[in-house]
A protein has these predicted regions:
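Beta-propeller and closely related beta-pinwheel folds
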Residues: 45-60, 157-169, 203-216, 290-449
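Autoprocessing Asn-cyclization modules and mimics
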Residues: 85-152, 207-286
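Short, surface-exposed terminal/edge motifs of secreted or surface/virion proteins that either
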Residues: 71-86, 123-125, 131-136, 190-207, ...
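Beta-sheet repeat architectures centered on beta-propellers
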Residues: 1-86, 156-160, 165-181, 353, ...
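Structural signature of WD-repeat beta-propellers
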Residues: 75-77, 187, 253, 307, ...
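Internal, charge-rich low-complexity segments
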Residues: 85-94, 199-216, 501-517
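Hydrophobic or amphipathic alpha-helical targeting/insertion segments
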Residues: 173-215, 296
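Short beta-strand segments and strand-loop junctions that repeat across beta-rich extracellular domains
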Residues: 80-85, 153, 192-198, 311-339, ...
């Protein structure tokens, strides 16, 4: 009888659906809710609700930080909210009573110019501030010198003030980008939105706005009276600069056609086009061509719009770019017909697929269609940008399916995951894992696939809705560690999108006094300051209307998490050599692992007499590495299997294991 060791069990990860007897002994044939970590395999961290209570069903989340405060921006289908993540407090400098309208504090840094503060149990509205005072305050109670003052409201509705609610859908949801510190978002059904800066920072009192000078926008220079064709047959506006020579524009809810234009007039007018109703319109009313785009991304000091819909007509292969924007502002023009600005457009017409998305990669901008990939590089006037096809066959499966990392772009493509290093696109999924992923995806929910990067863990998450899932939102992620090139899998909670940034861990105690656990049981970092600054993924779950912080605790929010790794097809004999004909007798498993607290793992042994037969799994055995060194089992077969599983609130790490094996001769292999 010999002890055969299997080490570095996290070196490769999971190769699901591969013929397991062909795998190296330290590769897992199945598993879920696990991750690789420096050659070991360990349980995936849990996730916990944060920023409660989210006022909308969240479909997109991103963080913007420009000094203080720090905001998470959450977009739903109809509205956009921001969450103040700063946690700002100050202290009263002198007592106040109900007659006071000015409140003196140590500092107002991090507080809004207009807002609400809380002292004790009282919420106090104020209308202004200086460096050390809140002014225009309405106080109803008395408060003592030295009392703590905090920002009261953390969720703010920043939906645009004019234009009404948004019209996004769950299939064509939002994208976001930052250009010169300005947040820009779009959704393919509304004009792109931007969050204007005030003195170089963002304020929750500032609403989102329709993107300035987005093609094409002007204002009436004089009212339109009546509902017929005006006399003379023209409509005067401030400028027709960004409008085509003929077409249709919108005023209010009316579509108006024109056959020609001068610098300030549209001529050859047609009223109430496209089934709209002709109406009167006031002087200075907005006149615009309704233009949407599937995605908008920042590149250098340009905005790049991808897959254009204009006046109801889709141009799915068109790329538009703005003129260059000054710092902390949006571009002044998108007019590609004039040589006085750098705006332009180009159609990627050599393949028939739609443009899905794009993203900067070093000094180039990569554009991904359904069926191809392109590089867009700055060349200056007169062309501004040059376009080069990188692949005529590989693209992105949906919008938000690209993540940047040190090695380039990670792309969720059709039929594989790819890495674009700027020169070529390389597939990265092992064959059998690829087969598993693309036979597991719910084909009706492909548009909901997305990719997220967890830079702190050097991981890329490829997220999708598994066939047969209870929800249409993604519930499964393949996790690729791009440093170790390992793959694992995990469950995610009906997530429409993930953002990356700072948010506190609600599971960790905030002070020594509040800690009720021991060093052995706590799973977070020791230093709370790092826990607050460490960036993590935030999950946007529109089904439960919640936001979750990844890497928080060991559970799926409040539910227990089942985590396991399994290896079938092992055929090592007592000499540690693969032997597909000899029968082996397994009498013990020696896990080399650690757990938090006094928790126990569940260990299984399975045996089989052939590659075609199923496994006879023996009874589960509990194993606590603090008090035990081995798991006593009994099984005989030509092939055998092991499984390590947990389903309680615990953390564990498995470095390797050894098997006590005795060669038991040869027998027939066919099972009947």
């Amino acid at each position: 009888m010999a002890l055969v060791a299997i080490e570095k069990v996290g070196q490769i990860g999971i190769a699901k659906e591969t013929s397991p007897w062909e795998l190296p002994s330290n590769v897992w044939s199945d598993g879920n809710n696990v991750k690789t970590d420096e050659g070991s395999i360990r349980k995936s961290p849990g996730f916990s609700e944060v920023m409660a209570t989210c006022p909308i069903a969240p479909y997109h989340i991103t963080q913007i930080t420009l000094g203080s405060p720090e905001f998470w921006v959450v977009a739903g289908l109809a509205k956009i909210y921001c969450y103040d993540n700063t946690g700002t407090t100050t202290t009263l400098d002198g007592s106040i009573t109900s007659v006071d309208t000015t409140i003196t504090v140590d500092s107002t840094v991090g507080f809004e110019d207009v807002g609400t503060i809380t002292i004790g149990s009282e919420d106090i509205v104020y209308t202004g501030k200086t460096a050390t005072t809140f002014t225009g305050a309405t106080v109803t109670e008395s408060h003592s010198d030295g009392a703590t003052v905090t920002r009261s409201t953390v969720w703010y509705d920043i939906t645009r003030a004019s234009g009404g609610d948004y019209s996004s859908t769950a299939n064509d949801t939002w994208t976001s980008t930052i250009l010169g510190g300005v947040l820009v978002m779009t959704n393919f059904y509304d004009k792109p939105q931007y969050w204007a800066l005030t003195n170089g920072t963002v304020l929750s009192s500032q609403k989102m706005q329709d993107l300035n000078d987005w093609p094409a926008l002007t204002a009436l220079n004089g009212a339109i009276t009546g509902t017929g064709v005006p006399s003379p047959d023209e409509i005067v506006v401030d400028s027709t600069l960004d409008f085509p020579t003929a077409g249709t524009f919108t005023v209010g809810t009316e579509d108006i056609s024109y056959k020609g234009k001068t610098s300030t007039k549209f001529t050859g007018i047609g009223r109430g086009e496209n089934g709209t109703t002709a109406a009167t319109h006031l002087d200075d009313a907005a006149a615009f061509i309704t233009t949407y785009c599937r995605s908008m991304r920042g590149f250098r000091s340009f905005l790049v719009a991808l897959n254009i819909k204009q006046a109801g007509v889709n141009f799915p292969r068109v790329v538009k770019w703005s003129t260059e924007a000054a710092t902390q502002t949006t571009p002044a023009s998108w007019n590609e017909t004039t040589s006085t600005v750098d705006a332009g457009e180009y159609e990627l017409a050599d393949t028939k697929g739609d443009i899905m998305d794009g993203m900067q990669l070093r000094d180039a901008f990569m554009i991904y269609k359904e069926d191809a990939a392109y590089s867009m590089t700055y060349v200056g006037t007169p062309f501004i940008f040059a376009f080069r096809q990188l692949s005529p066959t590989v693209g992105a499966i949906a919008t938000n399916c690209i993540a940047e990392f040190d090695g380039g772009h990670a792309i969720f493509g059709k039929g594989n995951f790819y890495v674009n290093d700027g020169q070529r696109l390389k597939p990265i999924l092992p064959q059998r894992l690829r087969d598993y992923v693309f036979t597991s995806i719910d084909g009706a929910q492909i548009d909901k696939c997305f990719v997220a990067a967890d830079y702190g863990r050097t991981e890329i998450l490829f997220c999708f809705t598994a066939d047969g899932a209870a929800s249409v939102e993604p519930n499964k992620a393949v996790v690729w560690n791009y440093i170790t090139n390992t793959f694992t899998m995990k469950d995610i909670p009906n997530v429409a999108h993930m953002g990356y940034g700072n948010v506190g861990d609600p599971v960790l105690p905030s002070t020594w006094a509040s800690a009720s656990t021991s060093w052995a049981t706590i799973t977070g970092p020791w230093t709370m300051s790092y826990a607050l600054q460490d960036k993590v993924l935030l999950f946007a779950d529109p089904v439960s209307t919640k936001l979750y912080r990844d890497r928080s605790g060991n559970k799926k929010d409040t539910a227990l998490m089942t985590s396991y790794v399994e290896r079938t097809g092992l055929a090592l004999n007592a000499q540690g050599q693969p032997d597909f004909t000899g029968v082996k007798r397994i009498s013990a498993i020696y896990p080399k692992m650690s757990v938090n607290g006094s928790n126990s793992m569940t260990v299984y042994l399975g045996t089989s007499m052939s590659t075609e037969g199923g496994y006879d799994w023996k009874d589960a055995v509990l194993f606590n590495p603090d008090t035990q060194s081995k798991v006593s089992v009994r099984g005989t077969g030509k092939f055998y299997a092991v499984k390590f599983e947990s389903s309680t609130d615990m953390d564990w790490e498995l470095d390797g294991y050894a098997l006590e094996i005795d060669n038991a001769g040869n027998r027939g292999s066919r099972e009947y």
